[in-house]
Amino acid sequence: MESRLIGWDIGGAHLKAVLVNDLGDILSAKQTPCPLWQGLDRLDAELDLLTDTLGLTQYTHHAITMTGELADNFENREQGVMAITDLMARRFGTERVRVFAGHSGFLMADHVSKANVPEIASANWLASGLWGATRLEQALFIDIGSTTTDLLPIRAHRVENRGYTDHERMRYDELLYTGVARTPAMTVARRVPLNGGWINVMAEHFATTADVYRLTGELPEHADQLPAADNGAKNIAGSQKRLARLVGLDVDALSEGGWRQLAASLREHQLSAIHASIQLQLSRGLLDDSAPLLG
């Protein structure tokens, strides 16, 4: 029987899976919402769904990265890593489950211990970076997701990160907690231009960046898989209403074009912050002008 491998990225909000055959050909790629902070049973339920959808068998091998250990239903990252690893091993068998542990490679599930937690926790960025380094001599790796942005220089086929843990990477602007769907819009800008003046943005979770990019026309609907900030409609009208609350207005205070301009302003604030962090990485002098962006 053909050997298959599935790669799982177990996040705090989404579960991602890519199934490949023994030649490395991608057979299927899936992403499903998985609010892990609501309990491990949510992960179990989504694994049930994808196991059936992808036709996984007892012969399928499983490779795992994770960021879900940060979910606040876990006491700490150690508990999260061990709980997620145990669940996957219980479901699919310890002999067929490998967990990515950074430069230590993939560990068999029953070899994962507390000592490995710092290498395993939130290391999916490194898995991507190491793969990219096998293909390109130099590049700036950038991954903008629903919640975070990763930046990582690659030079001489080596990743050149200064931080490893989330805390360290945030210190060096290699990890930015800003993304295109789940980021609260209030965190993107302190104030925005409106009707010829400046208006401070309310520090309330009224809207997300999904609303911003929906109004700019750049958000594929499949990218917004979790409920809106108000649990309301995920359409143009719903996004306008949520952005209106952010600046203390009702939706009829501006035209559709006015709300689109507000969204464009928030977009520019977010992109400016990402651009500044890119400039910081480039200022290290590791890459020459021919280095491509890898994303």
Question: Where do the protein language model's features map onto the residues?
Answer:
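Nucleotide/phosphate-binding catalytic cleft detector across ATP-hydrolyzing
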Residues: M1-G12, V18-I142, L152-L294
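Conserved Rossmann-like nucleotide-cofactor binding loop
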Residues: A13, T147
